[in-house]
Every structure is written in structure tokens, then in C-alpha cells.
């Protein structure tokens, strides 16, 4: 399974939930990419782990099985600008 993760976090617990998701995805041997700005927030929180990153213009393709969006409605709407015409399903975590 190949998963992209994106978030615009303004809540402290978003990184906590991200860490939980990463733990579960690791158990499934998933390949995980994290959006570059969200990854910086993850590292700035003191969390560790190396993950490849993506941006709005590079790093995503139609080989991804899922795009996880952390945030509210606006974040999911912005997530659509990442996946565009790639056909990647978006899963929202509010």
C-alpha cells in the first residue's frame, strides 16, 4: 500500500494522531510520503522518522492508494489540488 499524508495543522494533537497513523501504516508495511510542510511540522514537534515528501507540483502519481488529509473541510478542499486528475481517493481525518 502506498499512502500520501497531508495536513494544515493548527491543533496540537494533529501530530499525535499522525504518529499513531504512521505506527499503524508501518505495521502494514505501507510506503508513506508526507507533504513537505506537514513533514517539517512533524519533525519540529520532536518526532523522528524519515519519510519521503511531496509538494503540490512533485512527488505524487497514480500509484498511490490513498491520500490522507488531516484537518477540516478547507484542508480536504486543498487536498484536491494535490491529487488533481490522479484518481487517488482522499480520506479525511478531522
Q: Where in this protein do the model-derived segments appear?
A:
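A short, Lys/Arg-enriched amphipathic alpha-helix followed by its capping loop at the start of a domain
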Residues: 20-30
Amino acid at each position: 500500500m502506498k499512502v500520501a499524508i497531508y495536513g494544515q495543522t493548527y491543533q496540537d494533537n494533529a501530530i499525535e494522531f499522525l504518529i499513531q497513523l504512521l505506527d499503524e501504516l508501518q505495521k502494514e508495511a505501507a510506503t508513506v510520503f508526507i507533504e513537505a510542510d506537514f513533514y517539517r511540522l512533524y519533525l519540529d514537534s520532536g518526532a523522528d522518522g524519515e519519510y519521503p515528501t511531496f509538494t503540490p507540483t512533485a512527488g505524487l502519481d497514480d500509484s498511490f492508494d490513498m491520500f490522507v488529509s488531516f484537518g477540516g473541510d478547507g484542508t480536504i478542499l486543498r487536498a484536491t489540488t494535490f491529487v488533481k486528475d490522479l484518481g487517488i481517493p482522499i480520506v479525511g481525518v478531522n
